Amino acid sequence: METFDLESHLKGAYSSFPEAKHQPVIGITANYENIDATLRDRYYKQVIAAGGTPVIIPPVADSTVIVNTLEHLDGLILTGGGDHNPLWMGEEPSPRLHNINQERDAAELMLVRLAFNRQIPMLGICRGIQTLAIALGGKVYQDIKQMVKHSQDADRSEPTHSVEIKKDSTLYNIYGAEKILVNSFHHQAVSEPGKHMRIIAKSTDGIIEAIESNEYKQILGVQWHPEWLEEEGGKIFHWLVNQANNFYAAKELHKRILTLDTHCDTPMFFPQGIKFDHRDSRILVDLHKMTDGRQDATTMVAYLPQPQIGESFSSKVAFDVQGPAQYADLIFDKIEEIVSKNRAYLSIARTPADLYSDKRKGRKSIMLGIENGLALEHDLSNVKHFAQRGIVYITLCHNGDNDICDSARGCNTHNGVSSFGAKVIQEMNRLGIMVDLSHAGERSFYDALEISQTPIVCSHSSCRSLCDVPRNLTDDQMRALAARGGVAHTTLYHGFLRKEGEADIMDAIAHLEHAIEVMGIDHVGLGTDFDGDGGIRGLADSSELINFTLQLLRRKYSEQDIAKIWGGNWLRVMTQVQNFGK
C-alpha cells in the first residue's frame, strides 16, 4: 500500500551503513521538443533493472558543461529521436529527410567525442547508433531503401524482423546466437561506421543494425530499441552496466596508484611547434590525453639519432646546434619551458618522492631521460652535467654502435661495451642515474649487467620469444635481468610486438604476461614509446592507457600487482640507483 510517511521511505537508507551500495552512474541523453527535455521511462527503468543509477543529460552544447558531466559518469546511453542534420556529414539535405533536432545534434556529437576520448563505455540506440557513427567519422543514410519494413506499426515491444550477428562480436557474447529478432522504428541507418567502429550485425536486406568499437573499447550501437524488449532487451543494458562498473573500478584504482610510462619521444615533435596544453593531433602525449587516460607521469627523452659514418650529427636534427650535448640541453630547455607555462598542472620530477608529491597536488609529472649516450660526446664530465639537469636514465645506445657500446642494430664494433662505456656505467652508478639497455646488443647487455653495481633497466623492450627481432629481449636476458633486480618494460612499437599483421593491445598484454612468466611480477612494466612510432590499436595514445588497466583487471591481477606493473617496480629500482649514488 502507498504510504505518505517520509520517514518510512527513508528507513532503507537509514537502517544500515553505508546508506547505499555503489552502482555505476549511467548518463542517458534526453530528447528535446517544444522547450522540454524529456525521456521515456523505459530507458531509465532498464538501467535500474541492470543495477545502474540513471542520470538524464539535457542537450547542452557547452563543452564545460559536458566535460563536468562526464567526470561523474561511468557509462553513457545515446537515445532514439529525430534525424540528424546532414550538414554534420558534409551533405545537403535529401527531400526524404524528416524532422531534424538541432538542439540535440551539436550537444550529443560533442558528448560522444569527449566521452570517446575518456574511454567511457557507450551504448547508442536507434538515433544513438547514428550519433556514434557521425561523431566518430562515419556516415548515415538520410533515407534507406527498404526491402524489409524498418518502421513497424506493431507494438513497440513486438519483434518484427531478424538481425544476423557476427560470431566474434559483443552482441554474440551477449545473446549467444547468430540471429535474433528485434523491433524497428527508423528510416535512417549507418552507411559507414568510421575508422573506429566495425559492423557486427545486419538485417536480411543489408541494413547495418549494429556496430561496435574495433579498438577493444566498450562501445556498442544498435539500430533497434532494446529498452522496449523487456528481458531480452535488458541483456544489452546489463552489458553496459557491467562495463561501466569495470570502468569505475579502473578509475578508482588510478586514484590510488601511480601510473608511469617509462619512455616517450614527444620532444621529436618540438620542431613542429606542438602545444602540450592543447589536445594536439600531432602528438600522442599531451596534458589533455594524459588526463583523459588518467596517466600520472611520463618519462620524456631527448632522442639523439646515431649518424652513419661520414654523416654529421647536425644533419640529422632539425635544430641548429653544435653537437649532441647541446642538442640534449636544448630539448631539456624546451621541456622546462612547457612546464613553466603549465605550472598549475605539470611538473618535472626527479625522484619517486617527487612523483608522489605531484600526484597528491593534482599535477602531472615529466621525468627526463636521454636516448643514446651519444649525448655525452665522449666526455665523462657530461654524465655529471646531465645528472644535474635532472635526468633519471640514459639509454646507452640507439640504432647503431656508438663509443659506449654495440647496438642491437650495429656492427659489433666493440664486441659489447667499450672501455669508455664501462667508465660511463660506473659514473652513472656513482651519480644515481639508471643504466638503460633498450636498443643494446646482446653482448652489450651482458657486459653492462656485469659492470653495473646497481640493477639495470630496459625502459621499452619486448619479448623475443613472441616476436623474433634483435631489438627484443631473449628469455635468458630477462632471467639474468631479474636475477640482478632489474626491470624490463613492454613497449608498444608494432614491429616489436608482432612480425606479421597489425599489432594491438592484446599483443602488448601477451608480451607483458610472457615477461611476467619468465621474470616474475616484480620485474615488468610499460614503456610505450609514444611519439617514437609506439602506439597500437587499443593503446594508440596516452588517452587510452586506462584500457591497459582494464585489461589487467579483467585478468584478475590484484591492485598490488597492477601498481607494480604501472611503475612500482621501476621506482623500486630508481630508488636503489639513486640511493647508491648519494
List where the protein language model places each region:
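Proline-centered loop/turn at the N-terminus of a beta-strand
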Residues: 24-25, 53, 121, 139, ...
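Distinct, well-ordered alpha-helical segments
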Residues: 138, 353-355, 379-383, 406, ...
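Glycine-centered short loops/turns at secondary-structure junctions
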Residues: 51, 119-120, 137, 294, ...
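N-terminal hydrophobic targeting/anchoring segments and the immediately downstream early-domain regions
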Residues: 249-413, 468-489, 493-526, 530-582
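Glycine-enriched alpha-helix->loop->beta-strand junction motifs that scaffold or abut catalytic
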Residues: 216, 294-295, 391-393, 431-433, ...
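N-terminal beta1-alpha1 cap of cysteine-dependent amidohydrolase-like domains
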Residues: 1-125, 134, 141, 145-174, ...
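Histidine-centered catalytic micro-motifs
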Residues: 184-188, 221-226, 259-266, 440, ...
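Alpha-helix-loop-beta-strand connector modules within alpha/beta enzyme cores
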Residues: 414-431, 448-458
